[in-house]
A protein has these predicted regions:
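Short, histidine-centered active-site or binding-site loop motifs used for metal coordination
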Residues: 23, 110-112
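Conserved acetyl-CoA-binding loop-helix of GNAT-fold acetyltransferases
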Residues: 113, 118-136, 141-144
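Conserved acyl-donor/pantetheine-binding loop and adjacent beta-alpha core of acyl/acetyltransferases
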Residues: 68-110, 148-173, 191-212, 218-220, ...
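Short aromatic/hydrophobic-glycine micro-motifs
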Residues: 3, 139, 185-186
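Conserved acetyl-CoA-binding loop of GNAT-fold acetyltransferases
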Residues: 181-189
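ATP phosphate-binding glycine-rich loop and adjacent ATP-lid/helix-beta elements
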Residues: 177
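Short amphipathic alpha-helix that is part of the acyltransferase structural core
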Residues: 1-85
Length: 237
């Protein structure tokens, strides 16, 4: 499949298609309710990121999307990548925009492909589009708070143990981590509370169709770790 890649600045007509239900459904419903995601995708904010948002088109159909965000790194208070990962880099980018601080780095946020577009190097093509964008903007580095795409199969395994489990090829057993390493990336650190999703028990029931009727750990399909439930506080994380 030959994939043409455009920024949403170049092709604003593709914006509604990038958010059409077919691509939205690539992610579990609960994944759409991170406070950081709501900040990034809010219309006034997202309008400022169109140079860093990509649509992949094949045979006239949008079959892939990729989002990234520019931010300032190696400045006061940001000498290291954040433990908050995905969430924190969005907040950093938001703070930079609000204060007029110039960005010097790019962070990938998401690459999603419909099943028909997977394989054949399309995810690498989208990564390359991000790297080319960063180079054009004069950014020094490209980072990615990678969400391992098979970790949900072992939700109780600590993330560090999962990441350090290697296959016969010497790469992590997780195919998405392996893709980034083969593309020239390196693992810098674990972000222990990246993409934290907080909601009331009613919220989580609505997102998952499950009953949250007891406190403790609950395994939720698609989650990378057990969801921590408090009936007493009417909250789950």
């Amino acid at each position: 499949m030959d994939l043409e890649i455009f920024t949403l600045r170049e092709r604003p007509d593709l914006r509604p298609l990038v958010f059409a239900s077919e691509l939205q459904s690539v992610w579990s419903e609960f994944m759409r309710h991170s406070a950081a995601a709501e900040l990034y995708f809010a219309t006034p904010m997202f309008d400022g990121y169109l140079d860093y948002a990509f649509a992949g088109v094949a045979d006239g159909k949008v079959v892939a999307r990729a989002f990234s965000v520019p931010f300032a790194f190696n400045i006061a208070g940001r000498a290291e990548l954040p433990d908050g990962g995905w969430d924190q880099v969005i907040r950093w980018a938001h703070d930079d925009r609000m204060t007029g601080r110039a960005a010097n780095s790019l962070s990938a946020l998401e690459i999603s492909l419909l099943p028909e577009a997977r394989g054949g190097g399309n995810s690498l093509a989208l990564l390359d589009a991000m790297k080319a964008c960063a180079k054009t903007k004069g950014f020094a580095e490209v980072f990615a708070p990678v969400r391992p795409n098979q970790k949900h199969l072992q939700p109780r395994l600590p993330m560090r143990d999962y990441v350090e489990t290697l296959g016969p090829d010497g790469l992590p057993i997780d195919s998405w981590l392996g893709t980034h390493l083969r593309a020239g990336g390196k693992i810098i650190k674990i972000a222990p509370y990246s993409m934290t999703i907080v909601g009331s028990l009613a919220d989580w029931s609505r997102w998952t169709g499950m009953s949250f009727d007891r406190s403790g750990e609950l395994l939720v399909a698609g989650a990378l770790s057990p969801v921590m439930v408090s009936r007493e506080q009417d909250c789950a994380v």
